[in-house]
């Protein structure tokens, strides 16, 4: 699918709450200039759950047009409704997405058997590579190792984004999955240990404002240069902590504003950071000296 750092793109909005496609294109070009290896549209960071179907399609079409095949474009198509997920994933395939990322059904809190049935139904309905997305802190349900192994047998299910935060689970997962099945880290503070376990990259929030640094970290790990990787990961930790000091994507949108990308406020029910939180984020960003170059 890809190796290295992929960015879970933030979605820019105007002051009146509409999509800001000019800023979105600018964000994409900055990512590509920094050698980011993939782009995710309409995921958690992209506020996919508060986008209309028309907005999602517009963003995806824009990303596909701007990237022009330079890197894979992965569509965040997961919902907690199987029929809607199938329809959204079919739309992504029709528009030309390179893959679809499917979060576990949230709120419903289905069983492992239900997860197998849900993801299999989607995979059967589309001719598109599918990435499973495990983020139980946000969804209330986790994919077990056994379920992942079962789903990996489906030819269209080709990748797994692991964001449980459990390094032991990551080890069990990598041991159990077949060779060649792509696994990606989903937590910026765990890029080093997850890639040490064999993840072939990261789908990152951090890389929105810090694409070059995130890609440099991933490249060091792919090259087994753990001395460089430890330095980069360590130096980035205060920034990562600040970017997750509030619910994603609240801080990362503030960070993008700080570097000159007017991505606007998150959509309700999310709101901007508190003054104290924002001040801490900006202080941390200004203290960070960078590790690239």
UniProtKB/Swiss-Prot annotation:
Cellular compartments per GO CC: cytosol
EC main group: lyase
Catalytic center residues: 133, 161
Molecular-function GO terms, alphabetical: 4-hydroxy-tetrahydrodipicolinate synthase activity
Entry superkingdom: Bacteria
Pathway: Amino-acid biosynthesis; L-lysine biosynthesis via DAP pathway; (S)-tetrahydrodipicolinate from L-aspartate: step 3/4
Name of this protein: 4-hydroxy-tetrahydrodipicolinate synthase
Species assigned in the record: Exiguobacterium sibiricum (strain DSM 17290 / CCUG 55495 / CIP 109462 / JCM 13490 / 255-15)
GN (gene name): dapA
């Amino acid at each position: 699918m890809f190796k290295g750092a992929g960015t879970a793109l933030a979605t820019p909005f105007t002051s009146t709450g509409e999509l800001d496609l000019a800023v979105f294109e600018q964000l994409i070009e900055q990512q590509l200039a920094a050698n980011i290896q993939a782009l995710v549209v309409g995921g958690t960071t992209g506020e996919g759950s508060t986008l209309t179907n028309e907005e999602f399609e517009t963003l995806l079409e824009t990303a596909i047009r701007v990237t022009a095949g330079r890197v894979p474009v992965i569509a965040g198509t997961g919902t907690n409704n199987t029929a809607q997920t199938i329809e959204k994933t079919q739309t992504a395939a029709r528009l030309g997405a390179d893959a679809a990322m499917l979060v576990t059904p949230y709120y419903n809190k289905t069983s492992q058997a239900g997860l197998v049935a849900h993801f299999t139904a989607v995979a059967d309905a589309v001719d598109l590579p599918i990435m499973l997305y495990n983020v139980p802190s946000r969804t209330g349900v986790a994919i077990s190792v056994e379920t992942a192994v079962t789903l990996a047998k489906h030819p269209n299910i080709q990748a797994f984004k692991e964001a449980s935060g459990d390094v032991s689970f990551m080890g069990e997962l990598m041991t159990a999955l077949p060779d060649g099945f792509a696994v990606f880290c989903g937590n910026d503070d765990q890029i080093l240990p997850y890639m040490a376990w064999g993840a072939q990259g990261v789908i990152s929030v951090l890389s929105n404002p810090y694409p070059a640094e995130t890609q440099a970290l991933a490249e060091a790990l792919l090259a087994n240069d753990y001395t460089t990787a430890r330095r980069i990961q360590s130096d980035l930790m205060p920034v990562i902590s600040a970017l997750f000091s509030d619910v994603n994507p609240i801080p990362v949108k503030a960070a993008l504003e700080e570097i000159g990308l007017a991505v606007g406020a998150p959509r309700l029910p999310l709101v901007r950071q508190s003054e104290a939180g924002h001040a801490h984020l900006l202080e941390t960003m200004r203290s960070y000296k960078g590790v690239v170059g």
